[in-house]
Swiss-Prot record:
One of its GO terms (molecular function) is mRNA binding. The keyword NAD does not apply. PANTHER family: OS12G0527900 PROTEIN, PENTACOTRIPEPTIDE-REPEAT REGION OF PRORP DOMAIN-CONTAINING PROTEIN. InterPro entries: Pentatricopeptide_rpt, TPR-like_helical_dom_sf. This is Pentatricopeptide repeat-containing protein At1g07590, mitochondrial. Residues 1-20 form a transit peptide. It comes from the Eukaryota. Its main location: mitochondrion. Keywords: Mitochondrion, Repeat, Transit peptide. Belongs to the PPR family. P subfamily. It comes from Arabidopsis thaliana (Mouse-ear cress). PPR repeats lie at residues 165-199, 200-234, 235-269, 270-300, 305-335, 339-369, 374-408, 409-443, 451-485.
Length: 534
């Protein structure tokens, strides 16, 4: 019976392993904000996370040591992977390919490349089962990650000829791209064409990501042209990257153009496609369109994918749909393992629909069930209180945070600045902004949607006071993140000039050059500003 289960798992893990996702860390990936906190919780398409898979096996077997991956992960420093495999076999468990693929996928996700390489070296050396192309591909991948491209090339020549095939070449190209050796990667792609091998869409995904940095964006068109010339099979993940790049630039037209390109290529959109579309329109405050795409998510969702459900909670919160939000949260709560992140998203979503009591209940439930382990957990409740100007409650959370030994970060102070501004404590708001600026804030945080929306709310508070100077200072922040492409962002700034009764002849020009389309409110505010012309 165990052999049958193992064979079924092996097939499943083999398929997952072939579809190596673009979530593997690379410098360019981080530069373009492909992170949970920035916009979209995740772009993975698997129905269960590796953590859930292992937790499931623990429950089944009643003993965590019956999961090979966990045995390897729990090895003390200095103890070899070989010893874990020997003890595994000593307990009567055969080493199956499925167990190895699962372990490799988890080790990759955890960034434990050295352990992954140890595992593959042992598998190649001891040959506990019949080896295939995937084992050599894994060996090549982690050799390059730890020892560089030159060692990877040497290893490639020593791989048995029958396995120097399409998969291995694709992995070598991807490894070169991950190491930033683009010219060498292109040379290997040329060799693949000569050998008649197809280039995987994952290679082009990497090329697009490498060229997504500022100053290199024009090269993406060449990557797509090369992909077409190579007759590579279009893949949904490629279009997701293109859509996400445009969404991060707050370019709704660009997102829709990439989506249209997907449909023209005959690629079927999935739940992730609609998640990106719905979130992009929700952030742009185009709620009717966002609601339509949210309905498409509901129609296309496959199984209980926690990442999609997290996105649905965010969307229902923004759309004010409390009933649907509660339904989605009940589905998530039914999982064996509920992440702290899901609790935080639910807390913020219920607060958005106006149910503060429920938001507080969920945060306390998370505190009791998951424990308080990081500043982000406190920041979540802080954001809830500060958006409503409940500064006394926010101060209570801040004291609990520092009292438990957690250090406030720039996000903490940005939330407190908003809370003070909402409570009309403008001097204190400025002090908190200054304290946050004295702390390091990563580019990904500074350009994330929650940060930008909080900053815009502070601008609106200063605008109500007619404080043009501080409104302009904060506006510069959102401008650098290209959040100023929305008319409502400029409208907030224009209100500061109206309240201050100050004339500026360049406001309309700034708006147009900033990439925003004036709406009816923009024109009305600009007419009011003109009244103060000297």
């Amino acid at each position: 019976m165990r052999s049958i289960i193992a064979l079924m798992r092996q097939r499943e893990y083999f398929v997952q392993a072939i579809r190596r996702t673009t979530c593997v860390a690379s410098p360019a990936l981080n530069q373009t904000n492909f992170q949970a906190s920035s916009f979209l919780t995740t772009l993975i398409s698997s129905k269960k996370s590796p953590e859930e898979t292992c937790i499931g096996s623990e429950e089944e077997e009643e003993e965590p040591n019956k999961c090979l991956s966990l045995r390897i992960e729990k090895l003390p420093k200095g103890v070899t992977v070989g010893s874990a495999l020997q003890s595994w076999m000593g307990d009567g468990f055969p080493v199956h390919g499925g167990d190895v693929y699962h372990a490799i996928n988890r080790l990759r996700k955890l960034g434990r490349n050295k352990r992954a390489l140890e595992l593959m070296e042992w598998i190649i050396r001891e040959r506990p089962y019949r080896l295939g192309e995937l084992e050599y591909s894994y060996l090549l991948e982690f050799t390059v990650k730890l020892h560089g491209v030159s060692q990877g090339e040497k290893l490639f020549t020593r791989v048995p000829q029958e396995f120097q095939n399409e998969l291995l070449y694709n992995n070598l190209v991807i490894a070169c791209l991950d190491q930033g050796v683009i010219r060498l990667a292109l040379e290997y792609m040329k060799k693949m064409r000569e050998l008649g091998y197809r280039t995987s869409h994952l290679v082009y995904n990497r090329l697009i990501i490498r060229n997504s940095a500022p100053g290199r964006r024009k090269l993406i068109a060449k990557d797509l042209a090369l992909m077409k010339a190579d007759k590579a099979t279009p893949h949904v993940s490629t279009y997701h990257i293109l859509m996400k790049l445009e969404a991060n630039e707050h370019n709704i037209d660009g997102v829709l153009k990439a989506f249209d390109g997907m449909k023209k290529a005959g690629v079927e959109p999935n739940e992730v496609s609609y998640c990106i579309l719905a979130m992009a329109h929700a952030v742009a405050r185009l709620y009717t369109v966002a609601e339509a795409y949210t309905e498409e998510i509901e129609k296309s969702i496959t199984g209980d994918n926690w990442s999609t459900l997290d996105i649905l909670m965010i969307l229902y919160g923004r759309l004010g749909k409390e009933k649907e939000l509660a339904r989605t949260w009940n589905v998530i709560r039914g999982f064996h393992h509920v992440r702290s992140k899901s609790y935080l998203l639910a807390t913020e979503a219920f607060a958005r629909v106006g149910n503060l009591d429920r938001a507080e209940e969920l945060w306390l439930e998370m505190k009791n069930v998951k424990g308080l382990k990081e500043t982000e957990q406190f920041n979540s409740l802080l954001s809830v209180y500060c958006k409503d100007g409940l500064i006394e409650k926010a101060i209570g959370v801040f004291r609990e945070m520092t009292g438990n030994g957690f250090k406030p970060n720039s996000i903490t102070y940005r939330h407190l600045a908003l809370g003070c501004a909402k409570a009309k404590l403008m001097k204190e708001a400025l002090k908190n902004i200054e304290m946050g600026l004295n702390l390091k804030t990563s580019k990904s945080i500074g350009s994330s949607t929650p940060w930008l929306e909080t900053t815009l709310s502070i601008i609106e508070c200063f605008a109500e006071k007619g404080d043009v100077e501080n409104s302009e200072k904060l506006f510069e922040e959102v401008k650098n993140a290209k959040y100023n492409r929305y008319a409502f962002v400029y409208n907030a700034l224009f209100k500061a000039y109206v309240k201050a009764k100050v004339y500026d002849p360049n406001l309309f020009k700034r708006m147009v050059l900033g990439g925003a389309r004036p709406d009816a409110e923009s024109y009305s505010l600009l007419k009011l500003v003109e009244q103060y012309k000297p």
